[in-house]
């Protein structure tokens, strides 16, 4: 049987992979967005694990709201990224400082 600690360890590992992805690759915006989404999904998995362990559906309902916001965030982020790529022909974070006023 899979216990709560197994889910929490897996969530912590996924969160750590997301943090490492942010710190190791600060050049590519797509990798940054994917790392942030991985961290958010790790937190969601912990919400669902605690919700199941405590026999409460509030955590699972909260996850649906978080996933909705995350989907909107990803869509807006990718739309901004496409617009920047069309103008600058690059998605490097270092090259995006041209946007400063």
UniProtKB/Swiss-Prot annotation:
* Topology within the bilayer: Multi-pass membrane protein
Q: Which organism is it from?
A: Nitrosomonas europaea (strain ATCC 19718 / CIP 103999 / KCTC 2705 / NBRC 14298)
The protein's superkingdom reads: Bacteria
Which function does this protein serve? NDH-1 shuttles electrons from NADH, via FMN and iron-sulfur (Fe-S) centers, to quinones in the respiratory chain. The immediate electron acceptor for the enzyme in this species is believed to be ubiquinone. Couples the redox reaction to proton translocation (for every two electrons transferred, four hydrogen ions are translocated across the cytoplasmic membrane), and thus conserves the redox energy in a proton gradient.
Principal location listed in the UniProt entry: membrane
HAMAP family in the record, alphabetically?
NDH1_NuoK (MF_01456)
UniProt xrefs under PANTHER family: NADH DEHYDROGENASE SUBUNIT 4L-RELATED, NADH-UBIQUINONE OXIDOREDUCTASE SUBUNIT ND4L
> How is the quaternary structure described?
NDH-1 is composed of 14 different subunits. Subunits NuoA, H, J, K, L, M, N constitute the membrane sector of the complex.
What name goes with this protein?
NADH-quinone oxidoreductase subunit K
Keyword list (alphabetical) reads: Cell inner membrane, Cell membrane, Membrane, NAD, Quinone, Translocase, Transmembrane, Transmembrane helix, Transport, Ubiquinone
Q: InterPro entries recorded for this chain?
A: NADH_UbQ_OxRdtase_chain4L/K (IPR001133), NUOK/Mnh_C1-like (IPR039428)
What EC number is given for this enzyme? 7.1.1.-
Q: Which GO terms describe its cellular component?
A: NADH dehydrogenase complex; plasma membrane
Tell me one GO biological process term: ATP synthesis coupled electron transport
What are the GO MF terms of this UniProt record?
NADH:ubiquinone reductase (non-electrogenic) activity; quinone binding
What family is reported? Belongs to the complex I subunit 4L family.
Catalytic activity of the protein = a quinone + NADH + 5 H(+)(in) = a quinol + NAD(+) + 4 H(+)(out)
Its localization reads: Cell inner membrane
Record field: transmembrane: 4-24, 30-50, 61-81
